[in-house]
């Protein structure tokens, strides 16, 4: 599993399925969403840290970017003590993108038209980053705006998190190696997308 992750096999699988979905017109880039979920780690290991929401117990956090339909476009692993806002740039910058035109040259699509996020991303740095890249900003404002008002779009990423946690090895982390947990996360994203691809006529 780790060797294939180092060789990029799981990333390539995920990208191949996303390309097929993109070419079929299934991916919806009009509104994307980002969020994260924390899980406990049974052992000390790479990309773990004390969770501020779980009495300081050691854990990891999965950061996910999904399209309007909740299909995972990209995902990263960090320690549970990593603030969501710190991962926004890396999540978007390292997204390999999707080739939506089969057999035609051109850059893969990486950026949504608009991005939805909760108050954990309400920082000038995050808003500036999105504005500079021409991405519409829909981030709940701390102390002003109720995050539930954005729920009609953001609920899809919550559902995506629930899908990911149906994979037992992601719901509770056992592996010490960052490479191993990243492999499982990439494979889970690929399988979620493959389920959608299998329903195409």
Locations of regions flagged by a protein language model:
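Short alpha-helical elements
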Residues: 1-201
């Amino acid at each position: 599993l780790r060797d294939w992750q180092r060789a990029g096999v799981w990333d390539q699988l995920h990208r191949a399925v996303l390309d097929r979905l993109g070419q079929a017109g299934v991916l919806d880039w009009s509104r994307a969403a980002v969020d994260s979920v924390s899980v406990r780690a049974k052992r000390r290991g790479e990309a773990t840290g004390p969770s501020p929401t779980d009495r300081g117990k050691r854990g990891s956090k999965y950061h996910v970017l999904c399209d309007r339909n909740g299909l995972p476009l990209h995902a990263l692993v960090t320690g549970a003590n990593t603030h969501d806002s710190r991962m926004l740039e890396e999540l978007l910058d390292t997204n390999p993108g999707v080739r939506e035109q089969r057999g035609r040259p051109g850059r893969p699509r990486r950026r949504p038209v608009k991005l939805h996020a909760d108050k954990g991303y309400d920082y000038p740095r995050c808003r500036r980053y999105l504005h500079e890249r021409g991405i519409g900003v829909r981030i709940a404002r701390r102390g002003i705006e109720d995050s539930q008002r954005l729920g009609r779009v953001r609920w899809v990423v919550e559902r995506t998190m629930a899908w990911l946690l149906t994979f037992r090895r992601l719901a509770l982390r056992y592996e010490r190696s960052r490479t191993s947990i990243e492999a499982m996360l990439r494979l889970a994203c690929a399988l979620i997308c493959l389920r959608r691809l299998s329903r195409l006529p």
